[in-house]
Swiss-Prot record:
Residues 24-36, 48-64 have a biased composition (Basic and acidic residues). Component of the procapsid complex composed of 60 copies of the internally located B, 240 copies of the external scaffolding protein D, 60 copies of each of the viral structural proteins F and G proteins, and 12 copies of H. The record marks R76, R77, F78, R93, F94, R108, F109 as: Cleavage. It is found in: Host cytoplasm. The proteolytic cleavage of the internal scaffolding protein B releases the scaffold protein in order to continue virion assembly. This is Internal scaffolding protein B. The keyword Protease applies. One of its GO terms (cellular component) is host cell cytoplasm. The gene is B. It is an enzyme of class 3 (hydrolase).
Amino acid sequence: MEQLTKNQAVATSQEAFQNQNEPQLRDENVHNDKSVHGVLNPTYQAGLRRDAVQPDIEAERKKRDEIEAGKSYCSRRFGGATCDDKSAQIYARFDKNDWRIQPAEFYRFHDAEVNTFGYF
């Protein structure tokens, strides 16, 4: 009887040694916060979506703030004139303390003659 248990112990230790060299398979019964039976936990999914959307929201907010700053700059610089969003975004990037004339390539011309013949 004792011999049988000794042989079983040796066999068990040999199996354990062999199993160390084999890749470990994921135990489907183990639960963690991220998944249960291969389905992502809704709380974890919400976190993933929020992390993916957050940079987009921040970029949109930065763009909107830049446009508002540019419109304010246009209004002050050009005596109350309003700008479209694209021009306002360009003007927002100008140095507000630099009052030298800006290169013409930064201005948007809506005049068909200027656009057709390309004076600038």
